[in-house]
A protein has these predicted regions:
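Conserved active-site segments centered on acidic
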Residues: 1-66, 131-135
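Phosphate-binding/catalytic loops
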Residues: 63, 69, 75-136
Length: 136
């Protein structure tokens, strides 16, 4: 959801030429799968466009050099990411909610089914990242 929420916010601000936004998984469980149906429903309910062609891919060590920021939704994702990218000398890796000043993980809908709570957390994090003072 975060990829599409951030793309929508960037587009609304007319900044799409300044950002390249892409999501990737830290595990291999969903590789090749489309956006999860409840996530699509949540995005649709909020008018956030998404691609039916999007397929999950796993993050790679090369992504560290490709991207300015790598954002994890929760501490578990961060631990898994550290197995793929063990070092962060440039300080690129952050937790989503750290941008909001709230010291907790994004609500995980995988276990709760509460995609609305996840959407609101991700929206808050994405909006905070676009603020001029968004360096964590």
């Amino acid at each position: 959801m975060a990829e599409f929420i951030q793309k929508a916010l960037v587009r609304a601000k007319g900044l799409e030429n300044q950002y390249y936004i892409e999501s990737a998984a830290v595990s291999s469980e969903e590789i090749g799968n489309p956006v999860y149906p409840p996530a699509r429903r949540s995005l649709s309910q909020h008018g956030v466009p998404f691609s039916n062609d999007k397929r999950a891919r796993q993050v790679t060590h090369a992504d560290y050099d490709r991207f300015d920021r790598i954002i994890c939704m929760d501490a578990s994702n961060l631990r898994w990411l550290r197995r793929i990218i063990p070092r962060d000398p440039e300080g690129k890796i952050h937790l989503m909610m750290s941008y909001t000043g709230i010291g907790r993980d994004v609500a995980d809908p995988w276990y709760t089914g509460d995609f609305e709570a996840a959407f609101q957390d991700i929206l808050a994090g994405c909006e905070a990242m676009l603020r001029p003072s968004s360096h964590v």
